[in-house]
Design a protein with these regions (language model features):
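N-terminal beta-propeller domains
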Residues: 1-87, 146-229
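Beta-sheet-dominated scaffold domains
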Residues: 2-7, 115, 165, 205-300
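Repeated scaffold domains used in trafficking and secretory/extracellular systems
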Residues: 52-61, 95-110, 142-153, 207-211, ...
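A short beta-strand motif characteristic of beta-propeller blades
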Residues: 42-50, 87-98, 134-141, 195-202, ...
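Hydrophobic or amphipathic alpha-helical targeting/insertion segments
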Residues: 103-151
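Short loop/turn segments that connect beta-strands within beta-propeller blades
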Residues: 81-84, 129-132, 232-235, 277-278
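A short loop-to-beta-strand structural motif that recurs across blades of beta-propeller domains
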Residues: 76, 123-125, 226, 270
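Surface-exposed loop and turn segments in beta-propeller and other repeat-based domains
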Residues: 94-98, 183-205, 284-300
């Protein structure tokens, strides 16, 4: 006998079978839920031919009506667009191959239409003209002998986190540029120049800085075990930093996403969501245990 179960209660891995509400299921595979129904997920198809390098990171970049994929590996950078797609090597022409690794990967973003990427070992790279004939190049005005683990854009500024200067690592340090004009990159990162807005600030508390994501007009900075809010104030300090959550940080770079004004973050032991003031776990009991048990020890 077939019976229609309404209302559909979705996937629930926490409760035992005898405790499940009517219409709930305990596991599923190759389906997705939409408008209260489960439907077959149709799978995937190749959008492009095989990338010439093992891809460590990929960034979509739009110029006009054209979308490029900027793909970065351990030593090379490629871009691809169009159909049929053609992969083009856009590795920097000065400085040789890159020195990225699976431990550092690549990060960055796009500010004012200019992509900037960073691997924590080499000087940050920018794509001055988004075109197959233009290779990446070292970010102008970036200070010599300085690297950072993570770079992110916010407002008209670029931010660098977990900074190393002349071989000395400052894992709590936030460094920001002078604001960039539209279509350009920053003209200065010199925190000692009183005519510029560039600056530095060290966040207190245990744990290193891991990553940062905008949330409205606030940049949320995640350390390993705490979270800070960075807001623009102008004046002599330019930015204000204040503690937001203690005991809640981010597990690794890119372990967070913003959806409809809410951050969803993979912490050291949970997945939480917050709106900048209220924080809430979205896992419960068995699901949390399953997630932590099944993290890939090799890749993590």
């Amino acid at each position: 006998m077939l019976q229609k179960l309404t209302p559909f209660a979705g996937l629930n891995k926490d409760l035992g079978v005898s405790d499940l509400p009517l219409g709930a299921i305990t596991d599923c595979n190759n389906v997705r839920f939409r408008e209260g129904y489960a439907e077959l997920f149709l799978g995937q198809a190749n959008a492009y031919t095989t990338c010439p390098i093992p891809p460590y990171s990929a960034f979509p970049v739009r110029t006009g009506s054209t979308i490029y994929w900027l793909v970065l590996g351990a030593a090379k950078a490629y871009c691809v667009t169009g159909a049929p797609a053609t992969w083009t090597n856009i590795t920097r022409s000065a400085g040789g191959d890159y020195s990225a690794s699976l431990d550092t990967l690549w990060n960055g973003g796009v500010l004012n239409g200019v992509p900037v990427v960073n691997n924590g070992v080499d000087a940050p790279q920018y794509w001055s003209t988004i075109a197959t004939g233009t290779p990446l190049a070292a970010l102008p005005s970036w200070p010599a002998g300085v690297t950072c683990r993570v770079m992110r854009p916010f407002l008209n500024y670029w931010f660098a986190f977990d900074v190393t200067k002349a071989g000395t690592r400052y894992p709590h340090r936030v460094k920001w540029s002078h604001p960039a004009e539209p279509g350009t990159v920053p003209t200065s990162w010199d925190e000692t120049d009183a005519t510029k807005d560039a600056g530095e600030f060290d966040l207190d508390g245990a744990g290193f800085i891991v990553d940062a994501m905008p949330l409205g007009n606030t940049l949320i900075v995640y350390k390993q075990f705490s979270t800070y809010a960075c807001t623009y104030t102008g004046g002599s300090y330019i930015f204000n930093f204040r503690p937001l959550f203690s005991g809640i940080g981010m597990m690794a770079p890119d372990c967070g996403v913003e959806i409809d004004g809410t951050h969803y973050v993979f912490t050291q032991s949970d997945i939480v969501r917050h709106d900048g003031s209220q924080v809430q776990s979205i896992l419960d009991k068995a699901t949390r245990r399953w997630l932590l048990k099944n993290i890939d020890n090799t890749q993590y």
